Curated annotation (Swiss-Prot):
Ranges for domain Importin N-terminal: 45-111
Keywords from the named record: Cytoplasm, Nucleus, Protein transport, Repeat, Transport
Lineage: Eukaryota, Metazoa, Chordata, Craniata, Vertebrata
A single GO molecular function term of this UniProt record: nuclear glucocorticoid receptor binding
Compartments, record wording: Cytoplasm; Nucleus
Domain of life: Eukaryota
Predominant location category: cytoplasm
Name of protein: Importin-13
HEAT repeats, residue ranges: 24-54, 56-88, 95-135, 142-179, 194-231, 236-268, 276-325, 330-372, 375-438, 440-476, 487-522, 524-558, 562-600, 603-648, 676-716, 720-754, 761-803, 815-845, 860-893, 897-931
Induction of the gene: By cortisol.
Gene3D superfamilies with a match to the protein in the record: Leucine-rich Repeat Variant (1.25.10.10)
Expression by tissue: Expressed in fetal brain, heart, intestine and kidney.
Length: 963
């Protein structure tokens, strides 16, 4: 045992001599893989066996492992090794051995025809790979030969065994072609050869399928074989007889699944639409399945109904345009559409009672697109036929979207509820799309139904029906501009009449109100009809998401109409926040809603509400600042800081966001005096510093503090100016004590907004120099532990160069050290950090001429940068980053041409750099290409992509075909 493990260990490490790959050692390794309880030994054996499979010795041992006295596991490995050698190492085989390899493969398949099925399949795959490698020149009639050899009467295997073995071989042949690694030009030749060879396959399949004496196992194999071959894009008319036979086989329960798969694959081939006559012949066959479909639905046979639906949808969805064009056959196509409608409306609740209806939704998109793509006159004709169909579809979809009874829904698993939620979203998307076909009449239709339902005194309505109709409105109103609609006022009037006794209905009422918030902004008189419902729902934790998101939408869209309701909204919101009814994320949304609301108030009113809203939190924060740090306190601090951040994110009394809304927007006059947010921030600044002093080493707290100021800066812009000096001072102290990425991100915001203003340049320059100095010290200690800090630092440097290059002219800035650290950052394993570093260099290099210190350091250390870039392209960095490195090369070429032309030749001189796979000619070509291209950045990116593939040995492989 020890001896074996030593051998396997050595082989696993790549140190074993080739002689170790013997039959005996392979068998021992397989025994270890299957039966050794030690997982490390299993992994070791697996690694060794993978090496054995690709070794030259595999040609020898694979045949020996197939001997009759071996167990199936060993035989399977032998067959797999044979397949790997044939498919990947075909060039190893001398031409004169092709025939013996072929004959030996046939012999083994014949022997295993009555043996292990998994071994038989692997051997068939191996022979299929061999055939593909030899076709068409070395083996021009491969498929016909296979059929002839297996039909020979002198075989020792019984006819059924031979038949099944042949069918297995014919089945895997197209599958192996689809996954083969054949070069593109060979693939075309082999595909053409196989298309011709199907003439030897289909008559055999037809005969076996229609022969009454064929056993079920053979017929099933025939259908699978046909299914495999049609994916080679065989002309649909050549498949006609087999498709008809497959339709007949649908009546046999044992053959049903295989028949469905074969029919769907045949119909779904992209080329099939060319054969319109064949498609027209298929419609009656599909329509002939309606009785079987109805019976299946009646008997709760989900598998059968699912399969028949797949067939109908495959025909309708893939060929609706071709079939619509056949005007004289419009009635048969309409019958197919109605059959698909039946599948859409199949009884029962998805996904518990049925899983079929979801298959049909894409068909309705396709049909609508095809109808609307016709020229106006033809479209009008089809609209006349299909508008009633689409109105019926809306009714069907809304019925399918209905919730089950509360009792039934209570028994559903969480997974079933989630699937139903996704299904309803799909229905919502479909309704939104159908609106394009039906227009305003669809809204009127929904409104009439809802009105009749809510005002009828004859019978009590179900909440499910009401909810579904509202859901239809919501689906459309969320994405379509319904401001012109004459039914929305009536709908808003109906909503308060809805008797809400159910969470799902209440949720949909909320979301519908939210979807109509833009309409409410244009019709403020209606706000009072629905706002009380929303505020009432805020107090229900089960309606947390819907009520808070709806209030946020109303506050955002209708903020200039809300001052009369502001006191009530703030009071209700404060109450639910204090009672902790909502989860953290909803609390944050609620604060954003209040930020929108307060933005529209006069300054005095704003400050009054603001103090009322946050005073409790400030008191809690003061108390927490006095206490010894502990985990529960940290959660509370981060929560309070998060609430303030989200409030300040949207509290914009200067209405900066509205600047993009257009001149027609009703704006309040810009208030005079200090900004309320700045007033509050100045009041709590000392408190925040006190909190920081105790939590400075905690990244989450520091991040939460920075978020308050970062979001305030983004919202307030120039209004934040009074805070700049003290914030710069605080950030400097924070970063000097414990460097954190969030502090650098906030510094970047300050540079972006205020660095260009002379009054603010001194504190920002001081902060920039300080954080740069601290970060450079971090590089000396070992920056690899802080990729987030390096990432943020590189982004800060790039922003400084972009916004205020003067920051790089300061004598106290060590530009050389910054440059060297950025080169080091290019070698980080983290992609975002590398990307940020590349971004810094693409901003720095254009400044060579205007900033003396930058020009000097590029002249001295630019070669080091180029080598780092070439190393990355040579294989040290991810291929996804090549565009970023190409940007650096382009910038070097554009702004430092004379230096680059000297450096690149020197850098590429050493053998094996940047990759041992490159020839001197390839390196020379690359350098010349780069130096020639100083205008077209896209071309440089293409050159770099080509070069990196050469460096990695991937050029011209299928692996990089889409790269």
């Amino acid at each position: 045992m020890e001896r074996r493990e030593e051998q396997l260990g050595a082989a696993g490490a790549g140190a074993a001599p080739a002689l170790d790959f013997t039959v005996e050692n392979v068998e021992k390794a397989l025994h270890q893989l299957y039966y050794d309880p030690n997982i490390e030994n299993k992994n070791l054996a697996q690694k060794w066996l993978m090496q054995a499979q690709v070794s030259p010795q595999a040609w020898h041992f694979s045949w020996q492992l197939l001997q009759p006295d071996k167990v199936p596991e060993i035989q399977y490995f032998g067959a797999s090794a044979l397949h790997i050698k044939i498919s990947r190492y075909w060039s190893d085989i001398p031409t004169d051995q092709y025939e013996s390899l072929k004959a030996h493969s046939f012999t083994q398949i014949t022997r295993f025809a009555s043996g292990s099925k998994i071994v038989l399949t692997r051997l068939c795959v191996a022979l299929a790979s061999l055939a593909l490698s030899m076709m068409p020149d070395a083996w021009p009639c491969a498929v016909a030969d296979m059929v002839r050899l297996f039909q020979a009467e002198d075989s020792p295997v019984d006819s059924q065994g031979r038949c099944l073995a042949l069918l297995e071989l014919l089945t895997v042949l197209p599958e192996e072609f689809q996954t083969s690694r054949l070069p593109q030009y060979r693939k075309g030749l082999v595909r053409a050869s196989l298309a011709v060879e199907c003439g030897a396959v289909f008559p055999l399949l037809e005969q076996l399928l229609q022969q009454p004496s064929s056993p079920s196992c053979v017929r099933q194999k025939v259908l699978k074989c046909f299914s495999s071959w049609v994916q080679l894009e065989v002309p649909l008319q050549d498949c006609e007889a087999l498709i008809q036979a497959a339709f007949a086989a649908l009546q046999d329960s044992e053959l049903f699944d295989s028949s469905v798969e074969a029919i769907v694959n045949a119909i779904s081939q992209p080329d099939a639409q060319r054969y319109v006559n064949t498609l027209l012949k298929l419609i009656p066959l599909v329509l002939g399945l309606q009785e079987q479909l109805r019976q299946a639905v009646q008997n709760g046979d989900m598998e059968t109904s699912h399969g028949i639906c797949r067939i109908a949808v495959a025909l309708g969805e893939n060929h609706s345009r071709a079939l619509l064009d056949q005007v004289e056959h419009w009635q048969s196509f309409l019958a197919l559409v109605n059959m698909i409608m039946f599948c859409t409306g199949i009884p029962g609740h998805y996904p518990v009672n049925e899983t079929t209806s979801s298959l049909t939704l894409t068909f309705w998109y396709t049909l609508q697109d095809d109808i609307l793509s016709f020229e106006a006159e033809k479209q009008a004709v089809y609209q006349q036929v299909y508008r009633p169909v689409y109105f019926q579809l809306v009714d069907v979809l809304l019925h399918k979207a209905q919730f089950p009874s509360d009792e039934e829904y209570g028994f559903w698993s969480s997974d079933e509820k989630e699937q139903f939620r996704i299904y309803r979203v799909d229905i919502s998307d479909t309704l939104m799309y159908v609106y394009e076909m039906l227009g305003a009449e669809l809204l009127s239709n929904l409104y009439d139904k809802l009105g009749r339902l809510l005002t009828s005194s004859e019978e009590p309505y179900s909440w499910q029906h009401t909810e579904a109709l509202l859901y239809g409105f919501q689906s459309i109103a969320e994405t379509i501009d319904v401001n012109y609609s004459d039914v929305v006022p009536g709908l808003i009037g109906l909503i308060p009449r809805i008797s809400i006794s159910n969470v799902q209905l209440a949720d949909t009422v909320m979301f519908t109100i939210g979807a109509l918030s833009e309409w409410l902004a244009d019709h403020p008189v209606m706000i009072n009809s629905v706002l009380p419902l929303v505020l009432h729902a805020l107090g229900n934790p089960e309606l947390s998401v819907s009520s808070v998101s709806t209030l946020k939408k109303i506050c955002r869209e209708c903020k200039y109409e809300l001052p009369p309701y502001a006191a009530n909204i703030v009071a209700v919101s404060q109450d639910v926040l204090m009672k902790q009814i909502h989860k953290t994320s909803q609390c944050m949304w609620l604060m954003q809603a209040l930020g929108f609301l307060l933005s529209a108030l006069q300054v005095e009113e704003n400050l009054k509400n603001l103090h009322s809203l946050i005073s409790t939190y400030i008191q809690q924060l003061e108390k927490l600042a006095e206490e010894i740090p502990k985990p529960s306190n940290k959660l509370a601090i981060v929560h309070i800081l998060g609430l303030l951040s989200n409030l300040f994110t949207t509290l914009d009394v200067s209405h900066h966001e509205d600047d993009h809304e257009g001149p027609e927007l009703r704006k309040l006059p810009v208030p005079q005096g200090p900004n309320p947010v700045v007033v509050v921030l100045q009041q709590v600044f000392q408190l925040i510093q006190k909190v920081l002093s105790k939590w400075l080493s905690d990244a989450q707290v520091v991040e939460a503090v920075c978020a308050i100021f970062e979001k305030s800066v983004k919202t307030l812009l120039d209004d934040f100016a009074p805070m700049v000096p003290q914030l710069c001072e605080m950030l400097g102290r924070m970063y000097s004590t414990v460097p954190q990425a969030s502090a650098l991100d906030l510094t970047r915001q300050l540079v972006h907004i205020f660095a260009h203003e002379p009054a603010h340049f001194p504190p920002i320059e001081a902060l920039f120099l300080l954080v740069t100095s601290v970060t450079l010290s971090l590089f000396q200690q070992g920056p690899r532990d802080h990729p987030d800090i390096v990432d943020s630092f590189m982004q800060l440097l790039a922003q400084a160069l972009k916004r205020k290059p003067d920051l790089f002219q300061c004598e106290r800035l060590d530009v050389k050290a910054v440059f060297q650290c950025a080169v080091l950052a290019l070698k980080f394993p983290e992609a975002p950090t590398v990307k940020a570093s590349c971004g810094f260099f693409t901003e720095l290099l254009p400044r060579c001429g205007e900033i003396e210190s930058v020009g000097k350091v590029v002249q001295e250390d630019g070669r080091m940068l180029l080598i780092a870039v070439l190393e990355a392209i040579g294989g040290q960095a991810s291929r996804s980053l090549m565009d970023c490195f190409a940007d650096i090369l382009f910038a070097l070429n554009k702004h430092c041409f004379s230096l680059l032309s000297m450096w690149i030749k020197e850098a590429l001189q050493p053998p094996g750099f940047p990759s041992a796979r490159l020839s001197p000619e390839q390196k020379d070509t690359f350098s010349q290409q780069i130096l020639r291209e100083r205008v077209n950045k896209r071309r440089v990116k293409e050159m770099v992509k080509e070069f990196t593939l050469l460096c990695r040995g991937l050029h011209g492989t299928d692996y990089t075909a889409d790269y």
